[in-house]
A protein has these predicted regions:
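Helix-loop-strand module that forms the ligand-binding subsite of alpha/beta enzymes
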Residues: 1-40, 112-113
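Glycine-rich phosphate/pyrophosphate-binding loop and the adjoining helix
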Residues: 34-126
Length: 126
C-alpha cells in the first residue's frame, strides 16, 4: 500500500460527511497510504442529482473537476512519497511486532513481517 494514492468523496444529508471522510483517511493512513485527497459534500434537501439546485450542482461539479485535474497531473510512473506520519506508524507497529514475536515466534503477523524483512533493514516504501 505504500506509494499508493487515494481519493475520498463523501456526500450525505446534513452533517457527518467530513467525519466519515476523516475516518476513512485515518484507516488508509494506517494501511500506509500517504497521498489522500478528500472532498465532502453536504446536501440539505434532495439526494436525487436531478432535483439538486443548479447552484449546488455546479459547486460540486467544479470542485470534483478541480480535484480530477490535480490527480491527472500526477506522474503515476513514480510512487507517492511516503509521509513522515506513515513512517512513524510503521515503526511503532514494527516495535509491536518485534515484541510479540519474542513472546510467540509462531505468531502469524510476526512471521509475515519477518518474511518480508521489515523487522530488519528492508522498508516497504523503498
Amino acid at each position: 500500500m505504500f506509494g499508493k494514492r487515494a481519493v475520498i468523496i463523501t456526500q450525505c444529508l446534513g452533517a457527518g460527511g467530513k467525519s466519515t471522510a476523516k475516518d476513512i483517511a485515518d484507516s488508509l493512513s494506517w494501511w500506509g497510504v500517504s497521498c489522500i485527497k478528500r472532498r465532502s459534500f453536504k446536501l440539505m434537501s434532495e439526494i436525487d442529482w436531478n432535483k439538486i439546485p443548479d447552484k449546488k450542482r455546479n459547486e460540486m461539479t467544479s470542485k470534483l473537476i478541480s480535484l480530477a485535474r490535480k490527480m491527472k497531473a500526477i506522474d503515476y510512473s513514480r510512487p507517492a512519497n511516503t509521509g513522515i506520519i506513515v513512517k512513524m506508524k510503521f515503526f511503532a507497529v514494527r516495535m509491536l511486532q518485534t515484541g510479540l514475536g519474542k513472546d510467540n515466534p509462531e505468531y502469524t503477523d510476526f512471521k509475515y513481517w519477518k518474511a518480508n524483512g521489515w523487522l530488519d533493514k528492508t522498508r516497504p516504501w523503498k
